[in-house]
């Protein structure tokens, strides 16, 4: 995705947006569980600008530690892969029991 955007002569300034929750379990016996430790692990990778540990997570590892909803971090990973030399800043994090998910907002810039 990043290569395609950069290949366009008329690309100018482009904003990419990735959405998805952090840890949450949906429609399982564990529904309502949130794993703040795992959420912070993911956010620490974003803050450090280190995508490699996230790309190495297997489906099973994400499912175990982040729940079936934790698979949504793949959207984040796709965005991070499109922005070379990015730096991340976590603006907010909260495990929101009422929404049964770990919620965060992060800013990523080259």
Q: Which sequence ranges carry the predicted segments?
A:
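Flexible, D/E/H-enriched segments
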Residues: 3-10, 29-110
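Beta-strand elements within well-structured catalytic alpha/beta cores of enzymes
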Residues: 12-22
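Short acidic/glycine-rich loop or secondary-structure boundary segments that cap or lie
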Residues: 24-28
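Short, hydrophobic/aromatic alpha-helical segments in well-folded domains
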Residues: 1-4, 18-19
